[in-house]
Curated annotation (Swiss-Prot):
Induction context: Predominantly expressed when Metarhizium robertsii is engaged in accumulating lipids.
Signal sequence annotation: none
Organism of provenance: Metarhizium robertsii (strain ARSEF 23 / ATCC MYA-3075)
Key word Secreted present: no
Annotated knockout phenotype: Leads to thinner hyphae, fewer lipid droplets (particularly in appressoria) and a decrease in total lipids. Reduces dramatically turgor generation by appressoria and subsequent ability to breach insect cuticle.
Entry keywords, A to Z: Lipid droplet, Virulence
Name of the protein: Lipid droplet coating protein mpl1
Function statement: Lipid droplet coating protein that regulates lipid metabolism, appressorial turgor pressure, and virulence. Appressorial turgor pressure is important for breaching the insect cuticle during infection.
């Protein structure tokens, strides 16, 4: 579908429901604004526009008559595309979230293992410091005792967490088995 131009400006609203729906997504809209703000992208857009004006614009009047024959099919494809985007909106509501929220969620998900490792390291150092303070013995022997007792404390915490996790999974499995037996 041709978009009318006035003084070289393309109208901001395309005639396609699919494209309007697609441009309503914050991620796509922000991406387009970012590309338009980039000077290299502006040069590419100008080059593409000049190629369009040179090669495609003179041919468009000749394609008007054949376009009349295919326009119902184009409109139907546009309608199907818009309905598909509606289903995507229902199934994946995250596509409507603002770009900054998507960025922050993705960043926190990617950095989750790193942050947990930092927390674990800090916890072990805190346990070691408290064990070294409890022992009150200076020197290499005191540090060795603090290291061994830190290993015991951290192992005990890990086994306690694992025990509670497995107990919850065992209870969950027991209820599933009981439900299967009743059926």
């Amino acid at each position: 579908m041709a978009v009318p131009q006035v003084n070289g400006d393309v109208s901001p609203r395309p005639n396609s429901a699919f494209l309007q729906h697609l441009l309503a997504y914050p991620l796509i809209s922000d991406s387009i604004h970012t590309v338009r703000a980039n000077e290299y992208a502006q040069r590419s857009i100008k080059l593409g526009d000049s190629a369009y004006q040179t090669f495609a614009a003179p041919v468009l009047p000749w394609l008007a008559k054949p376009y009349e024959y295919v326009s119902p099919y184009v409109a139907r494809a546009d309608s199907l595309g818009d309905k598909t985007l509606d289903r995507i909106d229902e199934r994946f509501p995250i596509v409507k979230k603002p770009t900054s929220d998507l960025y922050n969620d993705t960043r926190s998900l990617i950095l989750f293992p790193y942050n947990k490792s930092i927390e674990g390291r800090d916890h072990i150092f805190d346990v070691y410091a408290s064990e070294a303070k409890k022992i009150e013995q200076k020197g290499l022997v005191g540090q060795g005792k603090a290291a061994v007792s830190t290993a015991f404390v951290v192992s005990n915490e890990t086994l306690g967490w694992l025990s509670s996790f497995l107990a919850a999974k065992k209870a969950e499995a027991t209820t599933v088995v009981k439900e299967k037996v009743k059926q």
